[in-house]
Amino acid sequence: KFYQDRLVMIAPVNDYFLEMKDTGSFSLEEVLQEQPVILREQGSGTGKSASAFLEKIGISEDKLHIAARINDQEAIKNLVAGGLGVSIVSEKAVHDYIDAKRLLQFELPGHIAGREFYIIYHKEYILKDYVCEFIRYLEHCYKQ
């Protein structure tokens, strides 16, 4: 395992969600079923993780008001920041918008919203220098 990521719910910075964030009291299920939801396309890793998360908390996608399925993480961040809905995304993918206060981040239950990334290779093969360099680069970029 070289990196552990987790999913978070992102929402626009507006009075409704700011109050939710300030009080800390909100029902994730209600928010996801009442607000428009912008999801990644179904074939993406994040899309699969979000679907698995929803299934684990007992929400089927047909109960959501899915406003769009988008294949671009930047587009999702911009749509949510523009007030067009909420989304479930990788925490790493949105830290820039969170830091810039363009989005609000809501934590999801960690034990079911996490995912792990591995570098897999055959242990009996001698890796080329450029492959070893790439692995070191990944480990450096995703240092926890």
Segments the model singles out, each with a brief description of its role:
Residues 5, 33-35, 82-83, 100-101, ...:
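Structured helix-beta-strand junction loops
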Residues 2-38, 42:
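Flexible hinge/capping segments at coil-to-helix
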Residues 1-8, 65, 99-113:
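Short beta-strand->loop
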Residues 28, 36-58, 128-129:
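Secondary-structure junction motif
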Residues 28-30, 77-78, 132:
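Alpha-helical segments flanking ligand/cofactor-binding loops in enzyme cores
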Residues 104-144:
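A late-sequence structural motif
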Residues 51-55, 59-104:
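Hydrophobic hinge/microswitch elements
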